[in-house]
Regions:
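Short loop/turn motifs at secondary-structure junctions
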Residues: 116-117, 172, 180, 204
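An acidic- and aromatic-residue-enriched active-site/binding cleft used to recognize and process polar
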Residues: 97-100, 125-128, 151-154, 181-182, ...
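Short hydrophobic alpha-helical runs that function as membrane-insertion/retention elements
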Residues: 119-124, 146-148
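N-proximal low-complexity "stem/linker" segments adjacent to membrane-targeting elements
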Residues: 11-110
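Catalytic-site signature of metal-activated, phosphate-bearing donor transferases
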Residues: 158-163, 187-370
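Active-site-proximal specificity loops/subdomain of glycosyltransferases
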Residues: 129-178, 186-187
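Short, acidic, metal-binding catalytic loop of nucleotide-sugar glycosyltransferases
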Residues: 110-119
Length: 370
């Protein structure tokens, strides 16, 4: 609050009044100054000021309303948590949208079956005349471990596919995992995911956030018919400050929570609280978790694989926006941010894509000189 000056502060030469040379302190607190200045404003300016003030109040009101709604939803959601004390009673499923993943899908399915997932729902978003998942894992489909939903030929459907999986299954399963084919959960000291999820530290947690740990291309150029864990063991070096891309999360959410809609790829439902892998409730910054864990509980993210496979990934298009990611220099700036940049690799990318990566060559030369 602004405090008016006392009499001592207003001590000045009265002759200055005759010369209209008001001291700054008087002019600052002069109540008539506002009226004089109003005359200088045009009607348009006054309208703009009124609109700005209105916008501030409306924004504040909406923020307050959202905060109240979030608090109420937090309380409401936690009332629906169903606790299970026996691993045998716990039911866990995996929801995975995919496109052009036939090379990797069998290893992915086998991995999650091995760690105790009860069922996998694959959302087939391939082109209508594209590859078919049924050709690769017929035995898992036949025995009911994998169920395929047909979303072939549809664009910009990632969020809808994820929400569809939740709405169809939240009454049946205690936990629903929303991971993609290049994401493998890592649980130190746990060989079965149910033993991890049934832990009492998650008794009041509607969601569990785990960080991505990126794996590099291991300087590989071509596809090899081996599991990605064998091909790409090298992890990206994580800086001490653990900022930026290193605190991206993906989410496991409880079932039996009604009136929810999946509205975010990373955090699933924005207004529902979540915990880290240690059971501590955390506040995300957008879809980043400041309190990371890269040692005990995280997701091995094989996002790029080899150079050829990364180019194929760009060609298949984006499941959120629907368009194909053009071969732009910025795309490979991101790629080389994770992976070792060499002259050979730059020239290979240029040859495969037609890109001009001369700026990267300059950067490489500058690094060698320094």
């Amino acid at each position: 609050m602004r405090v008016l000056p006392n009499n001592d502060e207003l001590d000045f030469d009265h002759d200055s009044l005759k010369n209209n040379s008001y001291p700054k302190i008087i002019n600052k607190y002069n109540p008539f100054r506002i009226k004089k200045n109003i005359k200088k404003y045009s009607i348009t300016s006054i309208i703009i000021i009124i609109l700005e003030i209105t916008f501030i109040f409306v924004t504040f009101f909406l923020s307050l309303q959202r905060a109240i709604k979030t608090i109420m939803k937090r309380k409401d959601v936690k009332n629906y948590i169903v606790k299970k004390n026996d691993v045998k009673d716990l039911k866990v499923c995996l929801c995975t949208p995919l496109k052009l993943e036939n090379k990797y899908i069998k290893d992915f399915v086998q991995f999650y079956q091995k760690i105790g997932v009860d069922k996998i729902f694959l959302y087939d978003n391939n082109d209508k005349d594209g590859e078919k998942i049924e050709d690769i894992i017929p035995e898992y489909i036949k025995n009911g471990f994998v169920e395929i939903s047909d979303w072939r030929g549809k664009q910009k459907q990632l969020m809808n596919m994820m929400d569809d999986c939740y709405q169809r299954n939240y009454k049946i399963y205690d936990w629903l995992i929303f991971y993609e084919v290049d994401e493998y959960i890592h649980l130190k000291n746990y060989t079965n995911i149910k033993n991890f999820l049934i832990n009492e530290k998650f008794d009041t947690c509607p969601k569990i956030y785990l960080n991505w740990v990126f794996h590099t291309d291991n300087d590989q150029y071509h596809y090899e018919k081996k599991p990605v864990q064998e091909r790409f063991p090298q992890k990206e070096t994580i800086p001490a400050d653990k900022n930026g891309r290193h605190n991206f999360v993906k989410t496991i959410i409880r079932g039996h929570l009604p009136n929810l809609k999946i509205d975010c790829v990373h955090r699933l439902v924005r207004d529902v609280p979540g915990c880290n892998g240690n059971g501590k409730e955390v506040q995300l910054r957008l879809f980043r978790m400041p309190e990371q864990d890269f040692e005990n509980y995280y997701i091995d993210h094989y996002f790029c694989k080899s150079v050829d496979e990364f180019i194929e990934k760009l060609n298949r298009g984006d499941a959120v926006w629907g368009h194909k990611k053009n071969f732009i220099v910025g795309t490979f700036a991101n790629y080389f941010g994770y992976n070792k940049m060499t002259k050979k690799k730059i020239e290979y990318v240029e040859q495969k894509t037609g890109l001009d990566l001369s700026e990267f060559k300059k950067m490489l030369n500058n690094d060698k000189k320094s």
